[in-house]
């Protein structure tokens, strides 16, 4: 069975807004590139999809080597966007307007590599339903003080207990925390 993995950068105070956080350095970028090697499908919400593309498609042709690799991989991967309003999508993307929990549970059963969840908007819903198997939080050494957070107040119905799998401290001071859902 495929695993569903959530991986995201966030500040010490839990801010996940891309505009509030610095870009990863080469070592952190390499970590995300390696993580993406075991993935063949990415799931986004509409807003994150519209932030990521066409940015990464363009970046794949203009950036340094690490960003080029990441952009090319991201653009080439199959993607699903969960949206009721998006009319069209590009870059190997299909739009799904049904329940994300049901769709991702179906996709987990299909043959293939892991599924990467690239949005926090669905995190409470997916986490509570037990869809997400692993969490990779890369903590940036800063307090953002504002912006969207990993989980907004009131969106998680009950606590989510996780089990630590691994940690990594990058030279930049960024810290990767790898968790899996705790077995009941």
How would you describe each model-predicted region?
Residues 1-184:
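Enzymes that bind and transform nitrogen-containing heteroaromatic metabolites
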């Amino acid at each position: 069975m495929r695993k569903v993995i959530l991986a995201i950068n966030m500040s010490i105070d839990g801010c996940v807004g891309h505009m509030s956080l610095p870009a990863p350095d080469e070592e952190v970028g390499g970590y995300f590139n390696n993580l993406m090697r075991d993935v063949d499908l990415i799931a986004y919400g509409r807003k994150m999809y519209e932030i990521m593309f066409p940015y990464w498609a363009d970046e794949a042709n203009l950036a340094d080597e690490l960003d080029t690799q990441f952009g090319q991989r991201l653009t080439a991967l199959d993607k699903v966007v969960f949206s009721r309003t998006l009319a069209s999508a590009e870059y190997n993307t299909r739009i799904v307007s049904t329940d994300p929990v049901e769709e991702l549970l179906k996709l987990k059963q299909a043959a293939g590599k892991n599924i990467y969840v690239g949005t926090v908007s669905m995190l409470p819903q997916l986490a509570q339903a037990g869809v997400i198997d692993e969490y990779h939080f890369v903590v940036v050494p800063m307090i953002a003080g504002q912006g969207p957070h990993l989980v907004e107040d009131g969106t998680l119905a009950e606590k989510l207990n996780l089990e630590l799998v691994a940690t990594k401290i990058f030279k930049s001071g960024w810290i990767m925390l790898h968790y899996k859902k705790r077995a009941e």
